[in-house]
Amino acid sequence: KCRRENLDRLIDGMYDEVEEKRDGLIIIGRCNKEALKKLNKKYKSVVSVNRNSTNYEVDEVLCDGKKIAAAAVEYLISLGHKNIGYIGQCHSEDRYNGYLETLKKHDLDVIPEYVIETKQTEAEGYEAMEKFFQSDDMPTGIYCANDISAIGMLKCLNKFRNRYYMPSIISSDDIQEAQFTRPMLTTVSLPKEDMGKFALYLLLDRLKGGHSGIVRMELEGRLMIRNSCSSVEDSMWSDYCI
């Protein structure tokens, strides 16, 4: 209730009650259903750009989080990994659900100790890697839901240079820094530029009367194979360096 009231005050405070609807709004990233409904009343055209669907609350350009996670986990499995961990958000998160579904598809166990819920920060990725170091049972492959946290994990590995445990790490987003980590980060690239272009197209098309129903446009991610993943047999050897 408190969150809902705070949301009401925040959105109402942004706009005059008697003000006519504004033209358009593009929302990048996660936005809860209540906020979407309120913003949809304030604008003539609202478009969401995200990895998690709005369930047809507004027009959306989507790179499906489940498919992103599936591509990442499938790649780890193709390298022989069976003990696969997850780092990232879990609640209402399509990438986490994609991780779970892909393990189930291959009859692989979901081990609770291999799942560490984190926010999207380098520091929390670093801390997650430290937790694995302290465990007696560690995954050989790890899917990290975002590049930023994965970079934190790689920095932790580089600092300790543990030559007896070097998991394969794969993530998603393909931010610029992913090409300059040591080792270079394997990730699933999102077509960010195209997502932005199509979001603008949908926004303008609705304003011009080109469509009235809710439109969902889905784009595919692309696996970017670099150096942070290797076969399961190599999980105990270190090529990590500062």
Regions found by a protein language model. Name each.
Residues 29-30, 146:
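N-terminal glycine-rich "phosphate-gripper" loop used for MgATP/nucleotide binding
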Residues 1-2, 8-24, 35-242:
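Bacterial carbohydrate/catabolite-sensing allosteric modules
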